A protein has these predicted regions:
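C-terminal accessory regions
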Residues: 152-270
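Conserved flavin/dinucleotide-binding core of flavoenzymes
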Residues: 149
Length: 270
């Protein structure tokens, strides 16, 4: 996907012909005969994916005319799928941050279903929301001092006054990270995240929101990126028309940087 900031650095580096490039052709994330792989290839070719019957199938679609109804369905489904306590099994992805099916509203809704407030549950404020013990959170800035980085996913295990302690699964057992009052803003709820934020990650089960109000982001490369994050199952919630819009839209916004041309002018081969 294009970078959130200016330019298109990696694409320009490849286009310049001055950088060594390796193309990965073998799929290891999903089984070779997985419907996810088959549909990813179809999406890449500009064809509609084939949806299997039943929300629990390997590649399914649940349609809703009302976007808030779609968001509520996602929250209920997420709660059912993680009722056994495996909070890392499911990840909700969505193209945008705003609207009923955006990251912000979905995280508030999912928190209400999964980790509601109670009289004996401590919480601490973060921009636009609160954190409670048990919440799934994401580090949103690189913090070299704490050895945690943008995109790391963890779970709040303790709140002591204004301090928040988070367990990150990739760290050794007991090697927790504590955030003081001024550092808590480095965290945000992570029940739902943007497709951009999910790049490079994988999850057993992906629930993807695809609705028409996100039309500005409905592009083929975004849909392809989202469904290929899943190892076992994909559930798309929203509108088949939104999926079709994304499949048929292979035009990415042109970015003018001259980086490729500058690299081509260089006599050095990297």
């Amino acid at each position: 996907l294009p970078s959130v900031g200016a330019g298109s650095v990696l694409k320009d580096m490849i286009r310049s012909g001055r950088m060594p490039v390796v193309r990965l052709e073998n799929v290891f994330r999903q089984a070779e005969v997985s419907p996810i792989v088959r549909n990813a290839h179809k999406i890449n070719r500009g064809q509609m994916p084939e949806f299997l019957a039943g929300a629990d199938s390997e590649f399914a679609l649940e349609e809703f005319a009302n976007e808030q109804d779609a968001a509520e369905f996602v929250a209920r489904t997420y709660a059912q799928l993680t009722s056994g306590g495996d909070w890392r099994r499911v990840q909700v992805l969505t193209p945008m941050h705003k609207n009923p099916c955006g990251v912000q509203n979905l995280n508030k809704l999912l928190q209400k279903y999964l980790n509601p407030p109670s009289a004996n549950k401590l919480e601490v404020n973060i921009p636009g929301n609160v954190l409670r013990v048990g919440d799934k959170v994401m580090q949103i800035r690189n913090n070299y001092e704490k050895d945690v980085f943008n995109g790391d996913i963890g779970r709040v295990i303790k709140i002591d006054g204004k301090n928040v302690t988070v367990a990150f699964p990739e760290r050794p057992e007991g090697d927790y990270v504590t955030y003081a009052q001024g550092e808590v803003e480095e965290l945000q709820l992570a029940y739902a995240m943007s497709v951009h934020k999910s790049q490079g990650s994988e999850y057993p089960y992906v629930i993807l929101l695809m609705v028409q109000s996100h039309y500005i982001m409905l592009q083929r490369n975004l849909l392809y990126t989202a469904v290929t994050r899943a190892k076992e199952k994909v559930l798309i919630v929203g509108s088949k028309n939104a999926v079709r819009t994304a499949v048929e839209n292979d035009k990415t916004k042109r970015r003018y940087s001259l980086l490729a041309e500058r690299l081509q002018e260089s006599s050095e081969v990297f």
